[in-house]
A protein has these predicted regions:
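Active-site recognition of the HExxH zinc-binding catalytic motif
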Residues: 54-69
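Preference for solvent-exposed, low-hydrophobicity sequence contexts
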Residues: 26-35
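Active-site-flanking segments in enzyme catalytic domains
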Residues: 34-37, 104
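Short pre-active-site segment immediately N-terminal to the catalytic Zn-binding motif
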Residues: 38-56
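Single conserved hydrophobic/aromatic residue that forms the stacking wall/gate
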Residues: 1-14
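A short, hydrophobic secondary-structure junction motif
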Residues: 52-58, 96-100
C-alpha cells in the first residue's frame, strides 16, 4: 500500500507507484518542526495512513463531482490555525478540496494543534447536499427543484466558509491560491518560513542514512 500514487477516472481511483515519497516530502517540510515522528527518511505507518487518507478523500470527492475549491483555505484566521481547540473542531479548512493538507503555520509551541486536514469539511458536506439532495415533495419538477436549490444556496452565501472559487487562470485574487492557509497570507508565509529555517538547521540530524540526501 505504500508504493502507489493516485489518479482519477470517472468513478474510479487508480493506484500507481511512488506516493509514499511524495507524501513524506510534503509532510516533512510542513510539519517536521512540531511533529518529531516525521523526522526520518520514511513516514511511520500511522502518519503515512493519515496522509494517504487525505489524498484518497480528496480524489473520492472528485469522483462525487466536487471541484477544487481554492477559496476554502482563507475562511479561517491564521491565528485560529494555531489553536488546538479550533483545529480539532473545524480542521484546517472548510473543504478538503482546497489542496493544502498540512498545517505549515503551526509552530513548535502550538501543542496539540491539528497538523493534517484529512476529513470532509463543512463546505464539502454542503456541496454534496446541493448535488445529491432529493426533493420528493417537488415530484421531479426541475424548475421547482432549481428554486429550492437557489434558496438553499442563498441561506449560506454570506458565510465565508461556504465560498467557492476555482483555480485562477487570468485573474488574480489573493484569497484564491493553491496550497495556502489562513486569512493573513503574509503572516502565514512568515510562520511557514520560520519552520523551514528550523528544518534546514536540523536537517542533518533529523535525516540520516538517506541515499537521496
Amino acid at each position: 500500500i505504500r508504493d502507489f500514487c493516485l489518479s482519477r477516472g470517472l468513478g474510479d481511483v487508480y493506484k500507481r507507484q511512488n506516493v509514499e515519497s511524495l507524501l513524506h516530502k510534503q509532510r516533512f517540510i510542513t510539519t517536521a518542526t512540531i511533529d518529531p515522528a516525521v523526522r526520518s527518511a520514511r513516514l511511520p505507518e500511522d502518519r503515512f495512513l493519515e496522509s494517504l487518507s487525505a489524498l484518497v478523500t480528496q480524489e473520492v470527492g472528485k469522483t462525487l463531482g466536487l471541484l477544487n475549491n481554492y477559496a476554502a483555505s482563507t475562511a479561517y484566521s491564521t491565528a485560529n490555525l494555531r489553536s488546538a481547540k479550533f483545529t480539532s473542531e473545524h480542521g484546517l479548512a472548510p473543504s478538503i478540496m482546497d489542496g493544502e493538507f498540512y498545517n505549515y503555520v503551526a509552530q513548535p509551541s502550538d501543542k496539540g494543534v491539528r497538523l493534517i486536514n484529512n476529513v470532509l469539511g463543512e463546505y464539502d458536506r454542503y456541496a454534496i447536499e446541493w448535488g445529491y439532495r432529493y426533493f420528493p415533495e417537488e415530484e421531479g419538477d426541475p424548475a421547482r427543484e432549481a428554486k429550492r436549490l437557489v434558496e438553499f444556496v442563498n441561506k449560506k452565501v454570506a458565510n465565508p466558509i461556504y465560498r467557492y472559487a476555482p483555480r485562477q487562470t487570468y485573474s488574480v485574487d489573493p484569497t484564491v491560491r493553491t496550497e495556502d492557509l489562513g486569512d493573513d497570507h503574509l503572516m502565514s508565509s512568515t510562520l511557514g518560513m520560520k519552520n523551514l529555517a528550523i528544518i534546514r538547521s536540523q536537517l542533518g540530524q533529523w535525516i540520516q542514512n538517506d541515499p537521496d540526501s
